[in-house]
């Protein structure tokens, strides 16, 4: 009955000709307090009465306008009422309705509850649909109207209102929310827009047609509002891309290509780098790496990385690209830019003794990254440029085979060797020995290993040699020749596996697990007895003590009395396990004067004379023993190591002795360097062909590591890019100082930088350096370093612009990278080897149970007004800590998730604090960077950990009070997220 009474009141006012303010006073007398006019549908009732005749009733319309101005009725009910009027033939009524819309559509607001704000979004979308239908009606009417001028005026009125509504970013944002809230209604809008698009094509007026097309274009842009980002300022270089490529090529050649592809794609997206410039930077980094890599194994690894792994990674990146054909064009463009860097390419060609670019072009063509025509054109251009390039004058260059060509030929050879190794070893051990002997010649082994590492086959390669090593443990009745072959197969496989473990990491050797089976001998020996990778071995550990004392004594007697090791029926794995205990006995005898130096020389010659693996096992124990001795007690141990590492000269050695000694010397050099680097003792091995480890002993002696870190970062910043040697320095410093020390000190260096250009450069370089262990460094940065800066008022001055803005950018980049990769794949080899003792237990710092809040969460949640959490997540009250991640049931077991949740709570408290300053400005930059780095769609990004209550605080910050930012920082896939966004938008 209320509706009837309302109509009666309106009719009485019209009959008695009440003025608008008299009408308002009397209406409030007629109806009790507590009943809102929207519930009574006052706006709809007034419009119904005003639009009864062919022309609108001006008096009743004045009542409606007064109700709008005095906020008796909400904008949403007025728009809903207007959208229900569908008699477009009544021109005067339509004109009046459009004038009413003019009163408020340019500044829509709602200060009620979130549901009322959502209602305004729905009403605005309904009004948009109504305007589209109205414009379509007048467009169609123009075909038959007798007075085209009047018809065009009516259409122009509709289009002007459409443009007025759609021209406001805020209004489009509200419609965007309504689209997600009511997809069926948005479908109706799209259909109306389609009908208008079809109608306007026949419009005679160019001006009206352009006006209508502009409105249609604005409507089409609404679904993609979040995908529009500000343009990235173009720079001359992208140090992050360079450093990420350098890091991968220097320290993670064996890693799977997919994580590299995802990381490169993340960097490209976050920094808004055009694809052709991104590809150019990748190739530049590869060529610089080729030029600066140390000769030997590292050079081969870089060559394999550049010519095998990177083309394959870019082929995977192409599959991620939305338009693959454009990718090929961008690749062509990147090579065109690269060809302009003639001095760089000439230096690479001089180093590699070949045309590097032509080989890269051929590889890209094989993988479908370049067309045949483009490849030929680019090769012709480079050939012409090379005519002017300096040539090496050395006469031996014509005989040097270029490493890139060797690597490319080695790649199919790896596959063939794997097939050969699959055969039954017992049928033709001599043939297999011939294959292995060929692998040992020259640098064939390192070429094959580098090619296998770059193509992801190294682990399979190593497994084959472990199987071969295990095969030699099975002894039958054997002749002297068979015993020689078996000894050689054991020795070569053992040495190769040691070399692989030292060059590419022990994870290449380790199997996934041996359930129900015995661990292979070499795996067991490597894990317990082999020095390296930061392991400090105890020479008295049981692994160095053979349980069968009789066998040890027999071995000591054999070494001391015999002129050479016997081979037949010898169980080489048992000899390897017995050697440490035997060496201890021999060493003690020498120390006590029982054995002479000549006897020791004879014993060491026996050990290394036939099977070099025995010398490796002996030195493994000796270097562990040396660490336990004082400086004045080491002479005899070091002398034994030198004797074991020196090659023998004579004919009484087994086949491939010189090749095996070269590998043995390299293994011993590496083994001793890693273990003795802290004892200021160096042992040089003079075997022909052995090369010093290129990255050992590179930290300056007697210099505090903090100064080393500061110097390394300063020089890198001035140079603008990070080289491979410096990357190894940073990795060593991270290992020595720990994650917190490393992160905290680098952030301090960043905050000291007051030059804008250098601060932004520092961010790119630090992001790449943090890739050494992104997950752990991000946890430290977000969980320790940032909270310390934001909660300590004495440190707030450090967050001023530009260093504060730079730190915000670094934090967001690290957070987004870590969050996007935390559930993908395994950590890289260098991360698995890192010690974790210095990382605080995040499970206790941020408890798993939501009811068991951390100290920080209790502090920040102490002012909550609503404590009850309802069963339905969508119906939960908006307390200060509820976030989208909780509604999505994101796992709180992940340390990064807990750190992000607590960081956003801290940010929320900074925004809500009474004191504003640099810390507030930092939060603003942090949120701006989150929005800038947001992926299309935004679902699953770090912003889901932001409390919903924080949105209303953010819009109070002037630079964050934009509709696009509100849409970006809220999870619009959730009903609660849409309500929060609508409430924030309508308050702008």
Curated annotation (Swiss-Prot):
Organism domain of life: Eukaryota
Single GO cellular component term: mediator complex
UniProt KW Repeat keyword: yes
Residue span of motif LXXLL motif 6: 856-860
Motif LXXLL motif 4 in this chain: 555-559
Swiss-Prot/TrEMBL keywords: Activator, Nucleus, Repeat, Transcription, Transcription regulation
Intervals of motif LXXLL motif 3: 445-449
GO BP annotations, alphabetical order: positive regulation of transcription initiation by RNA polymerase II
Motif annotated as LXXLL motif 1, chain positions: 128-132
PANTHER family named in the record: MEDIATOR OF RNA POLYMERASE II TRANSCRIPTION SUBUNIT 24
Protein family membership: Belongs to the Mediator complex subunit 24 family.
Known role: Component of the Mediator complex, a coactivator involved in the regulated transcription of nearly all RNA polymerase II-dependent genes. Mediator functions as a bridge to convey information from gene-specific regulatory proteins to the basal RNA polymerase II transcription machinery. Mediator is recruited to promoters by direct interactions with regulatory proteins and serves as a scaffold for the assembly of a functional preinitiation complex with RNA polymerase II and the general transcription factors.
Name of this protein: Mediator of RNA polymerase II transcription subunit 24
Organism: Xenopus laevis
Gene giving rise to this polypeptide: med24
